[in-house]
Amino acid sequence: MNTLFISDLHLHSSRPQITRAFFDFLRQQTHHTQALYILGDFFDAWIGDDDDDPLPNAVAEQLKKLNSAGVAIFLMHGNRDFLLGNSYAQRAGATLIAEGTVIDLYGRPALLLHGDDLCTLDTDYMAFRQQVRNPDWQAQLLAQPLAARRALAAQLRAQSQAINNMKAESIMDVTPDEVVRVMEEAGVDLLIHGHTHRPARHPLTVQGRPAERIVLGDWHHQGWCLDASATGLALRNWDI
């Protein structure tokens, strides 16, 4: 049996090849797959569960098929789809899980994060994150008409891309001290996250013991997946 972890697909109607690759990925799962964890930025933007764009509904249908075949599906918010709600998760046969969830991964506790909250040196982004994760701010946004929300999402996405182009690469990566801190706080020696688009396996030391941070890849020219089983962990990629 195995458990799969993916993130940062950034599904959007302008990137149909990524959606096709994701559907192919779902169809390839066998009865050996126990669970699929999607750790944020599944969608490139999320303006509410009431969005009438056909893409989210098509994705929900495919996820529901996988869930009906016996695979548990878990969704975590990212910095692009933090408004994703329980209504959509239920339609997709999925369960929303909080950032910082610790799971038992074949006898090994693993901390799951999207990863943006580890980038503490990017102070401008951290302030923005605090604002948009505020329940009152979110409620005000969701009360607006779909067209207004869609326009705001496009504006925020364009601003983010422009700002990131001017930032040093180092501040957009995780802060090593923060990684160790959250792992110590959670009492784990394994952290799995996405967000940075820098897939890799990083050995480190936490409380004097060997530990590991695994970074999931973004789906662009390649698909990425962490495949976990009782026999080990494998970070896999393939061409799209």
Curated annotation (Swiss-Prot):
It is an enzyme of class 3 (hydrolase). It is a peripheral membrane protein. Its main location: membrane. Keywords: Cell inner membrane, Cell membrane, Hydrolase, Lipid A biosynthesis, Lipid biosynthesis, Lipid metabolism, Manganese, Membrane, Metal-binding. It catalyses: UDP-2-N,3-O-bis[(3R)-3-hydroxytetradecanoyl]-alpha-D-glucosamine + H2O = 2-N,3-O-bis[(3R)-3-hydroxytetradecanoyl]-alpha-D-glucosaminyl 1-phosphate + UMP + 2 H(+). SUPFAM superfamilies: Metallo-dependent phosphatases. GO terms for biological process: lipid A biosynthetic process. It is found in: Cell inner membrane. Pfam families: Metallophos. One of its GO terms (molecular function) is UDP-2,3-diacylglucosamine hydrolase activity. GO terms for cellular component: cytoplasm; extrinsic component of plasma membrane. Substrate binds at residues 79-80, 122, 160, 164, 167, 195. Pathway: Glycolipid biosynthesis; lipid IV(A) biosynthesis; lipid IV(A) from (3R)-3-hydroxytetradecanoyl-[acyl-carrier-protein] and UDP-N-acetyl-alpha-D-glucosamine: step 4/6. Its EC number is 3.6.1.54. This is UDP-2,3-diacylglucosamine hydrolase. Mn(2+) 1 binds at residues 8, 10, 41, 197. Mn(2+) 2 binds at residues 41, 79, 114, 195. Belongs to the LpxH family.
